[in-house]
Amino acid sequence: MNRLKDQYLKEIVPALMSKFNYDSVMEVPKIDKIVINTGVGDATANAKVLDSAVEELALITGQKPVITKAKNSIAGFRLREGMPIGAKVTLRGERMYDFLDKLVTVSLPRVRDFRGVSKKAFDGRGNYTLGVREQLIFPEIDYDQVSKVRGMDVVIVTTAKSDEESHELLTQLGMPFQK
């Protein structure tokens, strides 16, 4: 079993139950899924750019990404409906805990001038969104193989009913929030 999931079941669930006075173990918030999304605006001009982004996302997550397509046409961006413009991966189960563990312990500390992640990125329903400016912070990405530095969005979806519960859950899981 994953280290983070083991910690969640043995330490975090009892701690959250006592802090928020839950009656049942099923009320305790847990991480439902993690969605990693990267937008590739250059894909409209050059289709090969998208292939490298998909390959990098697959290396980072260990799962094949889904190519996202444009929902509507925007003439100013020379974009037609149905054109491929990005890639996303939805992680659940073991891979989700593996990715979160790697993100918190290895990748985020590698960010330059890192002082913690923002506390304001909760959406009001207990979900947390984190923007990563460059894919180079992940250990799987080789610096010499990167054609262009790309960012990505990491959305952590929880079953928490409020931001306070979600914040406490992520803090217990080791997410380094700003002081």
UniProtKB/Swiss-Prot annotation:
Keywords, alphabetical: Ribonucleoprotein, Ribosomal protein, RNA-binding, rRNA-binding, tRNA-binding
SUPFAM superfamilies the UniProt entry points to: RL5-like (SSF55282)
Family matches, as NCBIfam families: PRK00010.1
Keyword rRNA-binding in record: yes
Family: Belongs to the universal ribosomal protein uL5 family.
Encoding gene, per UniProt annotation: rplE
Protein name: Large ribosomal subunit protein uL5
Pfam families reported for this sequence: Ribosomal_L5 (PF00281), Ribosomal_L5_C (PF00673)
Ribosomal protein as UniProt keyword: yes
UniProt cross-references to Gene3D superfamilies, sorted A to Z: 3.30.1440.10
Purpose of the protein: This is one of the proteins that bind and probably mediate the attachment of the 5S RNA into the large ribosomal subunit, where it forms part of the central protuberance. In the 70S ribosome it contacts protein S13 of the 30S subunit (bridge B1b), connecting the 2 subunits; this bridge is implicated in subunit movement. Contacts the P site tRNA; the 5S rRNA and some of its associated proteins might help stabilize positioning of ribosome-bound tRNAs.
Entry's Gene Ontology cellular component terms: cytosolic large ribosomal subunit
One Gene Ontology molecular-function label: tRNA binding
Subunit description: Part of the 50S ribosomal subunit; part of the 5S rRNA/L5/L18/L25 subcomplex. Contacts the 5S rRNA and the P site tRNA. Forms a bridge to the 30S subunit in the 70S ribosome.
GO biological process, one term: translation
